[in-house]
């Protein structure tokens, strides 16, 4: 645990290690890979680590991470706020020193922070150096201070912009597209790490908000890694009530372990060093496994169980159904690479091994009832392993395969290089037939799967092996299965493509196959070998013309193109037609804003958002005058009331934002006698979404005059608004349009299947990846496990998001 030893954390506590140019020259050394997204997300974690350090020192309890609509990220904490006084050596504010000098911060001054969670990091200055723009907001000593930076250079001194009683720091940054190949943040990657941090730092509240699509999570767990294990076992059946937990220190190394067995067959062990996850384990995992096997074996030996049961157990049996977290605190850890995926510090193995051995033996002796349950499960696992071995031998002896050693249903390809070979797993024999005819025989193999394959989430290993469809699949893949025989390097195809129908059964079969790969061959997903084919959703016919359409977005685009084909907009009775390109661009922008309104609908009612398109814009400058905001609000409410068709009543008032020194409009909507307030606050008016609405507003305002009309073909339609013009054109274009929704692959002939789904030059595929292993594990357990209640909750929670095709 961190402790603060000096309350005077100010400018003089900040220790400086200089040199920021090196960061821009070799960003990969400081932040990780700038091409594959790891460095980009590390930027967020670097800022979050600073807030976590504040929390560990007892200064902060709430951290809010927001992905904004413009792909910037802000990290806000309610800590003490970065010091704003002038630094004695540097002559500028301490905040500016922290933001512009490499490795500057209170973590290097032993009196301010005794233990630092973010010490492995490189400081927020690196984030600043690699951002096109960074906005720093500090709430401290009654004032709000703000400063902007560009690629690490301050654009102005730290300035007081408002007053506040709150304290804390907000860092918002826009990563530089010149440095990062990808600048789009992935919600799942951030959620995975923030969830880990909230468990590893018990009691810290971390909120993650995605303004792009409204996703939101709140990670707040008391109970540390013990709670983490309980969370991982949620929706599973733990076989003993309370997780085994201990914390110890050996030779200056802190060891913390929590574990609990469930009645499943999968092992889930997560390792951390100084809060950093090791995907590939390392010396702490080796020490843990060695001690676990040894202490359990010695217990079973002493109790005479192995003799009585006549069974030989292995370490793998002991880890069946095991969920464990190993967290070590090491003063100077050594990793196998820059990514810190594997710990190689040799002293950690003996520290973990001796602590684990001692505590596990104590636990087994002090909890005989739990020990008996655990040991019985291990003995059952050993028996199942033996049964599976016999089943495999039996299969070999029976010669269930054809002469080539491959299943008869498999139509193999000629190519022998796995990197160039593709295996299509096709639902049903009819689609399998079309695929076999339509494929490229050189590189594409087809394996039709009949009916639904076994749900491996619920089945024991020996039952799984006796399933015909699973057996066929394992043989075709060629990489074996089970701990003794599985070798992903022997895989015969590096593109395994799941191709199922676009109906409920197809989705179920796809989920069953994904469950199989995730539980039995996770390396194939990790190596990027598993794909999902994306056959077209629609076939549209207009007259004699036919075309395939991939998804709803493309359908919308197609309808728009059709609507504008030969269409003309005349803005008044005698005006010539608007330029076709200008009209098309305006319609595209209008549609983009309509989608934006759909997204914002969770926060503001649609009539208010639609009204903003036609209301003269409000600016930050206007918001400095209360009377200007009042007048704007009155005019807006009049416009809303005039358009009102439902029983809604609107009113407006203003509120003062002391932090920003501006007046904000508050729109009150009364519906069925209930008042709801909607705040058009500084952040909204200053944000990207409102900027897009204003841009459209400027183009539409006063565009149509008296007598405006739209023409399409022979038809003429008078219109009063641009919205009316677009709606009429789309409605007209749909006349005579036949839309066929594809549900089965068998509905396409071989040529159509090749052209739309299998031709490498034109097909679209989704690559299956696991960005958040914990969330993936939870989802597979919820959807495919034994427990019905969590599945019902999941359906109730997500029912409204389902896209029904009735």
UniProtKB/Swiss-Prot annotation:
Quaternary context: Heterotetramer, composed of two GyrA and two GyrB chains. In the heterotetramer, GyrA contains the active site tyrosine that forms a transient covalent intermediate with DNA, while GyrB binds cofactors and catalyzes ATP hydrolysis.
Miscellaneous remark of the record: Few gyrases are as efficient as E.coli at forming negative supercoils. Not all organisms have 2 type II topoisomerases; in organisms with a single type II topoisomerase this enzyme also has to decatenate newly replicated chromosomes.
PANTHER family recorded: DNA GYRASE SUBUNIT B, MITOCHONDRIAL (PTHR45866:SF1), DNA GYRASE/TOPOISOMERASE SUBUNIT B (PTHR45866)
Location of the protein in the cell: Cytoplasm
A Pfam family the protein falls into: Toprim
Any GO BP: DNA-templated DNA replication
Family listed: Belongs to the type II topoisomerase GyrB family.
N-terminal signal peptide: none
Catalytic activity: ATP-dependent breakage, passage and rejoining of double-stranded DNA
Functional summary from the UniProt entry: A type II topoisomerase that negatively supercoils closed circular double-stranded (ds) DNA in an ATP-dependent manner to modulate DNA topology and maintain chromosomes in an underwound state. Negative supercoiling favors strand separation, and DNA replication, transcription, recombination and repair, all of which involve strand separation. Also able to catalyze the interconversion of other topological isomers of dsDNA rings, including catenanes and knotted rings. Type II topoisomerases break and join 2 DNA strands simultaneously in an ATP-dependent manner.
Cofactor dependence: Mg(2+); Mn(2+); Ca(2+)
GO cellular component: chromosome; cytoplasm
Keyword tags: ATP-binding, Cytoplasm, DNA-binding, Isomerase, Magnesium, Metal-binding, Nucleotide-binding, Topoisomerase
Binding positions (Mg(2+) 2): 501, 503
Sites annotated Interaction with DNA: 452, 455
Gene3D superfamilies noted in UniProt: 3.10.20.690, 3.30.230.10, 3.40.50.670, Histidine kinase-like ATPase, C-terminal domain
E.C. no: 5.6.2.2
Main location: cytoplasm
The protein, known as: DNA gyrase subunit B
Enzyme class: isomerase
GO molecular function terms attached to this record: ATP binding; DNA binding; DNA topoisomerase type II (double strand cut, ATP-hydrolyzing) activity; metal ion binding
UniProt KW Magnesium keyword: yes
Cofactor note: Binds two Mg(2+) per subunit. The magnesium ions form salt bridges with both the protein and the DNA. Can also accept other divalent metal cations, such as Mn(2+) or Ca(2+).
Binding-site residues, Mg(2+) 1: 427, 501
């Amino acid at each position: 645990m961190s402790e603060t030893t000096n309350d005077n954390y100010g400018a003089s506590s900040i220790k400086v290690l200089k040199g920021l140019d090196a960061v821009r020259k070799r960003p990969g050394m400081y932040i990780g890979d700038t091409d594959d997204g790891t460095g980009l997300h590390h930027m967020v974690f670097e800022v979050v680590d600073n807030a976590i350090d504040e929390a560990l020192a007892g200064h902060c309890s709430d951290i809010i991470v927001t992905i904004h609509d413009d792909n910037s990220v802000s990290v806000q904490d309610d800590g003490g706020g970065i010091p704003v006084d002038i630094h004695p050596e540097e002559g500028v504010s301490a905040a500016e020193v922290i933001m512009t000098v490499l490795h500057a911060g209170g973590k290097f001054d032993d009196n301010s922070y005794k233990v630092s969670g973010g010490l492995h990091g490189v400081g927020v200055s690196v984030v600043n150096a690699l951002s096109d723009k960074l906005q720093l907001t500090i709430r401290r000593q009654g004032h709000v201070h703000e400063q902007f930076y560009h690629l690490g250079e301050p654009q102005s001194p730290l300035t007081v912009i408002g007053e506040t009683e709150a304290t804390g720091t907000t860092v918002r940054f826009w990563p530089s597209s010149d440095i990062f190949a990808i600048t789009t943040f992935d919600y799942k990657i951030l959620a995975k790490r923030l969830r880990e941090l909230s468990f590893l730092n018990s009691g810290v509240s971390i909120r993650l908000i995605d303004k792009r699509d409204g996703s939101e999570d709140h990670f707040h767990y008391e109970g540390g890694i013990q709670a983490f294990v309980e969370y991982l076992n949620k929706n599973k059946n733990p076989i003993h009530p309370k997780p085994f937990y201990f914390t110890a220190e050996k030779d200056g190394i802190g060891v913390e372990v929590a574990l609990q067995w469930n009645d499943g067959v999968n092992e889930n062990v997560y390792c951390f060093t100084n809060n950093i996850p090791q995907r590939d384990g390392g010396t702490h995992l080796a020490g843990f496994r060695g001690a676990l096997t040894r202490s359990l074996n010695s217990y079973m030996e002493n109790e005479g169980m192995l003799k009585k049961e006549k069974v030989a157990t292995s370490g793998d049996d002991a880890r069946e159904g095991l969920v464990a977290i190993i967290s070590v605190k090491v003063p100077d850890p050594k990793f196998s690479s820059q990514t810190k995926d594997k710990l190689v510090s040799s002293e950690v193995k003996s520290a973990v091994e001796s602590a684990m051995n001692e505590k596990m033996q104590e636990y087994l002796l002090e909890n005989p009832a739990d020990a008996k349950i655990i040991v019985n499960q291990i003995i059952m696992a050993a028996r199942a392993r033996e049964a599976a071995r016999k089943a495999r031998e039996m299969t070999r002896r029976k010669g269930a395969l054809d002469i080539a050693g491959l299943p008869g249903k498999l139509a193999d390809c000629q190519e022998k290089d796995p990197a160039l070979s593709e295996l299509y797993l096709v639902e049903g024999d009819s689609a399998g037939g079309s695929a076999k005819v339509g494929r490229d025989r050189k590189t594409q193999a087809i394996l039709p799967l009949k009916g639904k394959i076994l749900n491996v989430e619920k089945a024991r290993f020996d039952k799984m092996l006796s399933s015909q469809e699973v057996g066929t699949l394992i043989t075709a893949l060629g990489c074996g299965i089970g701990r003794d025989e599985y070798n992903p390097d022997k895989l015969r195809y590096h593109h395994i493509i799941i191709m199922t129908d676009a109906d409920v059964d197809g989705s179920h079969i796809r989920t069953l196959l994904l469950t199989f790969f995730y539980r039995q061959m996770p390396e194939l997903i990790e190596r990027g070998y598993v794909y999902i084919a994306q056959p077209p959703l629609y076939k549209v016919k207009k007259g004699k013309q036919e075309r395939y359409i991939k998804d709803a977005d493309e359908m919308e685009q197609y309808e728009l193109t059709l609507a504008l084909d030969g269409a003309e907009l005349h803005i008044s009775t005698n005006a010539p037609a608007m330029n076709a390109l200008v009209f098309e661009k305006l319609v595209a922008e209008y549609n983009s804003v309509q989608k934006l309104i759909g997204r914002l609908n969770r926060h503001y009612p649609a009539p208010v958002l639609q009204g903003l398109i036609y209301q003269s814009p409000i600016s930050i400058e206007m918001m400095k005058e209360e009377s200007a905001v009042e007048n704007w609000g009155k005019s807006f409410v009049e416009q809303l009331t005039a358009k009102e068709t439902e029983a809604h009543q609107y009113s407006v008032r203003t509120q003062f934002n002391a932090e920003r020194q501006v007046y904000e409009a508050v729109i009150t909507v009364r519906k069925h006698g209930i008042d709801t307030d909607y705040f058009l606050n500084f952040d909204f008016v200053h944000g990207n979404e409102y900027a897009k609405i204003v841009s459209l507003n400027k183009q539409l305002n006063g565009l149509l005059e008296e007598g405006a009309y739209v023409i399409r073909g022979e038809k003429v339609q008078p219109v009063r608004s641009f919205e009316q013009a677009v709606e009429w054109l789309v409605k007209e274009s749909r006349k005579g349009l036949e839309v066929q929704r594809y549900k089965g692959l068998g509905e396409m002939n071989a040529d159509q299947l090749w052209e739309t789904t299998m031709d490498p030059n034109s097909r679209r595929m989704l690559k299956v990846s696991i960005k958040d292993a914990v969330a993936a594990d939870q989802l597979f357990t919820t959807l495919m496990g034994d427990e019905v209640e969590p599945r019902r909750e999941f359906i109730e929670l997500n029912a409204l998001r389902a896209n029904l095709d009735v």
